[in-house]
Amino acid sequence: MAAEYGNVQDQTVEDNQNVLFDNITPCARGLILHGNGSGIFTIKPPVTNHCTRYVRLLVLYHANVSIPAGGTPGPISFAFSINGEADQTVVATTTPTVAEALFNISLAKLITIPVGCCTQIAVKNITGAAVDVNKPHLIIMPPTN
């Protein structure tokens, strides 16, 4: 079960809001629920007869970001959001010195999800101001052990 999401449209993501994605290669087994144009992914690990109590997934994110035209240059930060809260353990930060200059950010996190429970993940702008996002790309997959 690996799934890929992206967005070819540039978007302005307000502070404390999620990056929006379209389906590229969605999960065909119904384990990842996502609607086109949404920023929230609901993960539903399958319940099995095994003693497994949790599932671990590797979540990878990459995008180009910039301060919008007319904005004040300063640090840009994004984090994964787990069930609505920004996870401060993995934060991508870059500091453009001029507006509209593109910089790359990347996030990677191993997320543990209890079997039988749903967990929502997203990519959240935690900058404190609006940020332009170009070509966001998200992959959700089981880790290779």
Language-model region placement:
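Extracellular jelly-roll beta-sandwich "head" domains, especially the C-terminal globular C1q domain
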Residues: 1-145
